[in-house]
Structures are given as C-alpha cells and as structure tokens.
Amino acid sequence: MNLNEKFFQAGANEPENVQDVLVENEKIVWNGKPQKKAFVLNNVLKMLPIAIIWIAFDSFFIAMVAMNFSDLPPVAIPFLCIFFVAHLTPVWVWIYNCATASKRHKNTEYAFTDQRIVVRKGLIAADFKSIWYKDIAAVNLRYGLVDKLVKVGDIYVTSVGKATVLEDLDN
C-alpha cells in the first residue's frame, strides 16, 4: 500500500475531497453524494416521534410547575430549571440534527475506487473513512418509508471491526 506522503509533512493542508486521499495509481470508479431531500428529510423524521412525545410529556409537567410556581420553595426553582433543561436532551438532539442536516449533507461524499470505498463525512471538519475491498464481510441494502418515497436507499457495508452506512443514494 502506497500512502501519499504529503499528508504527513508538517504544515500540510488537510484533504478537502476524496481525490485528495487517493493513493498512487488509484482510480475512482464512481463517486457521489446522498440525495439532499432524502438526507435532510430522514434527519428530520428520524427522532421526530420521540421528540414530540418527550416535549408533550415535559410540557405537561412544566405547565403544572408554572401553575403552582408560587407554592414552590425558592431553592426548588433552579433545580427544576436545570432538571427540565437536562431532561429535554432528546429534543435538543433532534433540534441539533435538524439544524445541521444541510451542512452535514454538504460535507458527505462517497467514492468507489478500484481498491476501496472512501467515505467523507463531518460537520465542521472532514472525516475520511476507507474500507478496503479485501476487508468487506457483507454488503446490505436497506430502505425505509422516506427512502421508498424519494427513490433512494442506504448501503450498509460491514467490514472487519466496523460498519459504515452510505446513506440516501439514488436507485
């Protein structure tokens, strides 16, 4: 395996795209991105039912606390505020996923080369994963309701010690 030595030099720029991480004589057979509509929609809908149930449940208790606010001891108020902010974590995670879906889509890229599969993902900085063909144990195709509606699917690649999902690829 020939590695590109320029990435190990001091002050070298980080790779920006899949072409920057190719080894010598490696050729891209196919590259692409997830379908944006499906990617964003899947991120929005993924935790939506849990977030709705969670916010409804907590809203009921927050409303009860608000109606009995004058009867509460002053020491309980900061505790209850911190508790509900922490207890709403699933809602905050869902909001984060919704707010960052477009940026994560922009930074997601897949490439099949003649030697491996390269996956670029990340929100702030790009993270590259390589799956060498010799290490692949299984490949599965899955699609959910949203995937069927927008005619995409997810490819699950299982390799030695890890699994990688290539999300929302066109059929």
What are these regions (language model features)?
Residues 35-36, 118, 162-163:
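Active-site/binding-pocket entry motifs
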Residues 2-5, 149-171:
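A membrane-cytosol interface segment of integral membrane proteins
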Residues 93-140:
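Conserved beta-hairpin
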Residues 124-127, 142-154:
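Short acidic, Gly/Pro-enriched loop/turn segments at secondary-structure junctions
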Residues 37-106:
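Alpha-helical transmembrane spans
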